[in-house]
Amino acid sequence: MNKQAKILLQTTIPHTEDDWHVGRFSLLAEHLRSLSDEAGNPLYDVTARDREEEPSGIDPLLSALDESEFDQLWLFAVDAGDGLSPADCAGITRFRKRGGGILSTRDHNDLGSSLCTLGGVGAAHYFHSKQQEPDPSRHSRDDNVTLNIDWPNYHSGANGDFQTIKVIDHELTRRPNGTLIEYLPAHPHEGAVGIPPSVEEASAVAIGTSKTTGRPFNLIIAFENSVDPYGNLCGRAIAESSFHHLVDYNWNPETGCPTFVEEAPGDEYIRTPEKLDDVKHYVANAAAWLTRGD
């Protein structure tokens, strides 16, 4: 039997029913578990987990992730800025330094800004109060409908709809037939990601376009393997502008959302479910790519 890669799907909040807890990523987990090799053997052993906190304020798994058997961490930063302790970030950083693959994603404004202290991939995430986008002209609202959410808040469409994207030819962006993916789930206020200065191994592989301003913005930044100054071969990594590309509500709005979500959902995926294939191809590509780095 093949050796399954072990994937940890992890949020940065304790389980809270009326929030983006890990149970709201069940369609993603189901899809990853359905992927198999040519002999029909499952490729991935998937664990889905919300943050757990000891009295000291650390998460016992994340703070020692480098000592675990996991091969990949898919980290959904759904916190308001305090979702990862310094010890958690250190454990995750060591995990990548020992070759672990990381997919990191967040959302608008400062949502998920605990990612800033992650080594390497954390520098690709831009927020409102800290680690802002390098271009000052982008320090302004893009989405002008949901007025209680400040920048970065790129409007790519309604939850439940899809956005048409631009991609480069990359292992992450290819369909099984060799053509390139064209669609990802839309969101009214995506966050901001970019290539950190002097990081040659990073590239923007998918770009969206705001439906309100027409501005292009990065959706996916891919980090190839790299050797750090201490000789560690760091695993591959991905920085995404919004966890809404992967959450159940954006794949199927009939699954529901927390009560604080104000915007009415769209129905494009319900009417044209075949468009959802592209994000599923991306997910399969990401799992394979993060596993394969060497």
Describe the residue ranges of each PLM region.
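Extracellular ligand-binding/catalytic regions of CAZymes and related secreted enzymes
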Residues: 1-34, 69-74, 112, 204-294
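Helical hinge/lid and interdomain linker segments adjacent to catalytic or ligand-binding clefts
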Residues: 6-121
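Catalytic beta-strand/loop cores that center a nucleophilic Ser/Cys/Thr
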Residues: 58, 132-241
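Histidine (H) residue identity feature
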Residues: 15, 21, 31, 108, ...
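A glycine-rich, often tryptophan-bearing local segment used as a flexible ligand/cofactor-contacting loop or short
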Residues: 10, 80-179
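Residue-identity detector for glycine
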Residues: 23, 40, 57, 81-83, ...
